[in-house]
Amino acid sequence: MDKSKALEAALSQIERSFGKGSIMKLGAKDSVVEIETVSTGSLGLDIALGIGGLPKGRIIEIYGPESSGKTTLALQTIAEAQKKGGICGFVDAEHALDPVYARKLGVDLENLLISQPDTGEQALEITDTLVRSGAIDILVIDSVAALVPRAEIEGEMGDSLPGMQARLMSQALRKLTASISKSNCMVIFINQIRMKIGVMFGSPETTTGGNALKFYASVRLDIRRIGSVKEREEVVGNQTRVKVVKNKMAPPFKQVEFDIMYGEGVSKTGELIDLGVKAGIVEKSGAWFSYNSQRLGQGRENAKLFLRENPELLREIETALRQNAGLIADRFLENGGPESDGDEAADM
């Protein structure tokens, strides 16, 4: 009994000092908050993440080689949030955002806040101010590699300033992490890959900006281009693989494959075919795809074309997939993602 009285006294003192709700039992009914998520624009990736999308109030890192689809994935997430009335911001440290492409992905440019800062300190100060406002749902920083410290910009070309960017990121994340959680704002950091020199064993790849982001991120996505999508001889898109390298919300290390079409973003038709086959909703016999005894086409690209021309059927398959999402998730995650019909795509 002495322990329980001492605990009650300590809890009441904490609540008097820091306010009601500053400490509570995790299982208490009023303390458990459902995690809000935002879709990535890819149903397969939403399933692989285990919670139906990317979590709000958390730090997300998307990294990969050049032209792998990092910014596309971030912009699609912004478009999905805007569809639900969310306010989004984009800190364009690379000064390379293409508004025409963003609009094609479904981003509402009139309601997208954009900043093109001069230095890393300015970018992170803007990020901190927007997060603390509590009015932003998603904030994208593109990219960590472009967050150049002021001292480096003002210095001479060739000056050696080791660890300065890592210290900048570490300090910023220490400040940001609490306000991100309180404001329920999702902050997506896009990052690039560098090679470590002299690595004999293991992967020589690393991300820029030091180790702080790896620790603070709740979800880390590794996105890679694994092939091309062709129509006859013309390349019209990339086959992309995303691996959930870190996930604090659900089991990690799941991976998913989908097509990113040039000027369109993630190919929902191709992805729904892959997921439908995996779940047994779409039948595949040889090269033919069919749904409810109706033939969709011979080869994956022809099936995609048929579904694009028949949006009602596409919606029907998507609804069936969403209704069976739990069953799909189990089978899908066990097998590590939808099968890639790269050979068929290349033959079309």
Curated annotation (Swiss-Prot):
GO BP annotation list: DNA recombination; DNA repair; SOS response
InterPro entries linked to this entry: AAA+_ATPase, DNA_recomb/repair_RecA, DNA_recomb/repair_RecA_CS, P-loop_NTPase, RecA-like_C, RecA-like_N, RecA_ATP-bd, RecA_C_sf
Superkingdom in the source lineage: Bacteria
GO cellular component assignments: cytosol
Residues holding ATP: G64, P65, E66, S67, S68, G69, K70, T71
Signal peptide annotation: none
CDD domains with a match to the protein in the record: RecA
Entry-linked Pfam families: RecA, RecA_C
Keyword Nucleotide-binding: yes
Compartments, as annotated in UniProt: Cytoplasm
Coiled-coil boundaries: none
PANTHER family per the UniProt record, alphabetical: MITOCHONDRIAL DNA REPAIR PROTEIN RECA HOMOLOG-RELATED (PTHR45900:SF1), RECA (PTHR45900)
Protein family per UniProt: Belongs to the RecA family.
Protein name as annotated: Protein RecA
